[in-house]
């Protein structure tokens, strides 16, 4: 029963991630990466990404509604 609950929460998290545009692996697109002829100092600061866990990202994007609180509580025990 616990496994079914975890699967349901993960499915919901995946659906929410798709809606809010969170990349599950939090990777930076190749276009923003420097190549051999571009040192890091030429990249704008905005291109630096911070890696957070999926759980943190979901909780941070939740609205303060009952549905959001329920999902956030469900995600919290997984992470």
UniProtKB/Swiss-Prot annotation:
According to the record, the signal peptide region is 1-18
Q: Where does the record say carbohydrate is attached?
A: 25, 30, 35, 40
- Please report the record's description of how this protein sits within the membrane: Lipid-anchor; GPI-anchor
Instruction: From the record, give the transmembrane residue ranges.
Output: none
Residue ranges of the region described as Disordered: 24-44
Chief subcellular location equals: membrane
Q: Which UniProt keywords apply?
A: Cell membrane, Glycoprotein, GPI-anchor, Lipoprotein, Membrane, Signal
From the UniProt record, list the residues forming the propeptide.
56-79
Q: Name one GO cellular component term.
A: side of membrane
**Quick one: where's the GPI-anchor amidated glycine lipidation?**
55
Q: Where in the cell is it found?
A: Cell membrane
Protein's name in the database: Uncharacterized protein YCL048W-A
